[in-house]
A protein has these predicted regions:
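Phosphate-end processing signature that detects enzymes handling 5′-triphosphorylated RNA
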Residues: 1-205
Length: 205
């Protein structure tokens, strides 16, 4: 939620696991001076999913130092866990790519929320942003949501943050709009870093 509050230097750390392939990575996402996302990945043992060992913490510090020129002095803690099923489609020519995520599950401690089984997140990537999949989605009146982040949506859906109005369009489409305001205990999670089981999709239809 740092970008929701206008903070220029932002860092998110997540542990990502691919269940079928039995692969695991520690990912560090940062914002450079141009506002572009920089993502660095470290191979990680599957049995260490959900934890950060010394090598993982050193990776975080190294990435932070290389971009910002300062040591990473923050304490990391697990805040939210996310799981979902993904289908990836890749065109044989042209480099067009589509991912379809479904059965999303968000969890913080004892609390959890899921999306309906017939609701999906579709992300498209093409050279000019006007690929075949984009044209089909537009014809079906399915237009991109301006702001979307699984982490932010999950935190809002579980009422772990005070402000989430910028993500209301995504929350409504996924039908996980929080029903009440968060308590101070829930709000204590703000500013921490997420651990999840897969990619965060930057574009949402």
């Amino acid at each position: 939620y740092d970008h929701h509050q206008g903070r220029r230097r932002r860092c998110k750390v997540r542990v990502r696991k691919y269940t079928d392939a039995q692969l695991c990575f520690v990912e560090v996402k940062l914002k450079d001076k141009r506002g572009l996302t920089v993502k660095k990945r470290l191979d990680y043992a599957v049995d260490k999913y959900g934890t950060l060992d010394d090598a993982a913490c050193a990776h975080v510090d190294r990435c932070y130092r290389n971009l910002y020129g300062k040591p990473f002095r923050h304490t990391l803690q697990a805040v939210i866990e996310m799981r979902y099923q993904r289908v990836t489609l890749v065109a044989r020519e042209g480099g067009e790519r589509m991912t379809i995520d479904g059965n999303l599950w968000f969890s913080i401690g004892e609390r959890a929320r899921t999306t309906r089984p017939d609701v999906f997140i579709v992300e498209t990537k093409s050279a000019n942003g006007n690929g075949i999949a984009d044209k089909i989605l537009r014809a079906l009146h399915q237009h991109p949501t301006a702001r979307y982040s699984k982490y932010c949506v999950g935190m809002a859906a579980l009422e772990a943050v005070e402000r989430h109005n910028k993500f209301l369009p995504a929350l409504r489409k996924l039908e996980v709009v929080p029903e009440r305001r968060p308590t101070p205990v829930m709000m204590a999670a703000r500013g921490a870093h997420a651990m999840d089981s897969a990619l965060t999709a930057p574009s949402f239809h």
